[in-house]
Amino acid sequence: MLCAIYKSPKKEGMYLYVEKRDKFEAVPLELRQIFGKPEFVMLFNLAGEKQLKRVDNQEVLQKIQKEGFYLQMPPPPENLHAEFVARQKGLK
């Protein structure tokens, strides 16, 4: 199954997957407002050999079939300070 992938102009790392290009009827209005005007990234074959980088193809496929869309949230921000402190404690 092909799906269309869009990125959010408002939130870096947020992506929206829909069954057909430019078909956003299944996406709730409030979510569309938060997401902003979708910027087309590409078409992707969820049943193909390639895997998505941050999400499971099957999970995306199931959500699209059930809800009409899949929303990929940005990864949590790295806490570099906490990582630095943890490394310093390990070195002492």
From Swiss-Prot:
<feature type="domain" description="YcgL">
    <location>
        <begin position="1"/>
        <end position="85"/>
    </location>
</feature>
<protein>
    <recommendedName>
        <fullName>YcgL domain-containing protein HAPS_0171</fullName>
    </recommendedName>
</protein>
<dbReference type="Pfam" id="PF05166">
    <property type="entry name" value="YcgL"/>
</dbReference>
<dbReference type="InterPro" id="IPR027354">
    <property type="entry name" value="YcgL_dom"/>
</dbReference>
<dbReference type="InterPro" id="IPR038068">
    <property type="entry name" value="YcgL-like_sf"/>
</dbReference>
